[in-house]
Amino acid sequence: VVRRAAEAEQAGTPALEARKLARLFVTHLHSDHTIGYPDLILTPWVLGRDKPLDVYGPNGIDDMTAHLLEAYKQDIDIRLSGLEPANDRGHRVNVHVVEPGEVYRDSNVSVTAFPVRHGDLPAFGYAFTTPDRRIVISGDTAPVPELVELAKDCDVLIHEVYSATQFAKRPSEWQAYHAHMHTSTRELADIARRVRPGLLVLYHQLFWGATDADLLAEIGESYDGKVVSGKDLDVF
């Protein structure tokens, strides 16, 4: 995450300079979504962040944070007590365990968390509302009515997806898993028809041999709105 943000900063988005990364909204605690969390705690601090990181996430984020800070205790202590000019604030974390509803607000944006369905793990999506935009991020989820209601007529819907065509070729045990945990291209087309976002951005794509063009074609069979298959560092 930090390295992608640094690339974005170098490409012309100064707000994503590493030392300015001060807030994190976590959808759920699967390892593929949190493996970069310690990097986001520590690297911006090493690069000059001088205030705690504010983290918002589901139940369990507090324990995960405490364990990570304990795991890196020796590194933190050496940086604070040795020759490195490290401050005593930027490695700290303010943890906010979220419930459905507004979880953050400042003069620029409000953030609303809504529950999604990703197996038995507590999971959320987030809606970001500014004076002139509303952007909704699904997180990992099977179709849920809460997302449809909250996202209606949003400017951008960023939603996970898997290829329905390639899903049919998966082993039965994996079909059962993915059908319960994720959203197919056909299901997402139905969601998009009801939401009518200004732009639908696909992310967390499960291709299984499909291409970006294949995903777009599958969705385009029953949805005629604007759709792109997102990549890191895309700007819309």
PLM region spans:
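Cap/insert and terminal regions of metallo-dependent hydrolase folds
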Residues: 132-134, 142-234
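Binuclear metal-dependent hydrolase catalytic cores
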Residues: 1-136, 214-236
